[in-house]
């Protein structure tokens, strides 16, 4: 039976992960793929199997990966698998997120960028790590692969659209589309408010014209000559009343507000 052998390495404590806002990474859209990604490689090592899982944290420390050191953005865990028994963790390699990074652009293909951690202490060894963020404009999913692990250096590749350079023109275009959407929303809002006012005006006009019509009928004025006179007079009266109503609304609302605020103020003053 294998005894649990735990090699646990952590570097200086820190809370900062791979800084996607750094000037080297600003031109990429890595913030859109923020999160933790893992890749496992199982090989037969009779009488057991060995599972090596590497995880990376993009724009934030690695989360929800058991046994990974706190505040690490690159982490490798080696487990021994034996049928009928619980996995035994034999190695834990953690690259703290505060380790000084080195950056190198990728010239081949559609480009990308390499993030490097160099000479990280792990027991008696120094370990290097490289994450190749490779631009793939046709990628439908984000693809993490383990390209190399020889006990001294680990090389991981991450293919994604997020690793493609976004030009200033495209950024302005996206901002322009957002502004157009905001303008359209404002126009829709303004149109809705305008139609609301027209609806109320129409209701008032119909109401007053109905009153006028009833008044004409009550007076018994049904001749053609008398109708225009009463119509013009009533219409003028309706318009004047409607204008007076609109003018009185602000003072009416102000009076209501003053009643509430005034009574509240007096109550506070009396209490003092």
From Swiss-Prot:
Disulfide bonds join 20-59, 68-75, 135-164. InterPro entries: Autophagy-rel_prot_27, Man6P_isomerase_rcpt-bd_dom_sf, MRH_dom. Residues 215-272 are cytoplasmic. Keywords: Autophagy, Cytoplasmic vesicle, Disulfide bond, Golgi apparatus, Membrane, Mitochondrion, Protein transport, Signal, Transmembrane, Transmembrane helix, Transport. It comes from the Eukaryota. Residues 18-193 are lumenal. The keyword Transport applies. GO terms for biological process: autophagy; protein transport. Residues 18-166 form the MRH domain. Residues 1-17 form the signal peptide. It is found in: Cytoplasmic vesicle membrane; Golgi apparatus membrane; Mitochondrion membrane; Preautophagosomal structure membrane. The chain crosses the membrane at residues 194-214. Effector of VPS34 phosphatidylinositol 3-phosphate kinase signaling. Regulates the cytoplasm to vacuole transport (Cvt) vesicle formation. Plays a role in ATG protein retrieval from the pre-autophagosomal structure (PAS) and is especially required for autophagy-dependent cycling of ATG9. This is Autophagy-related protein 27.
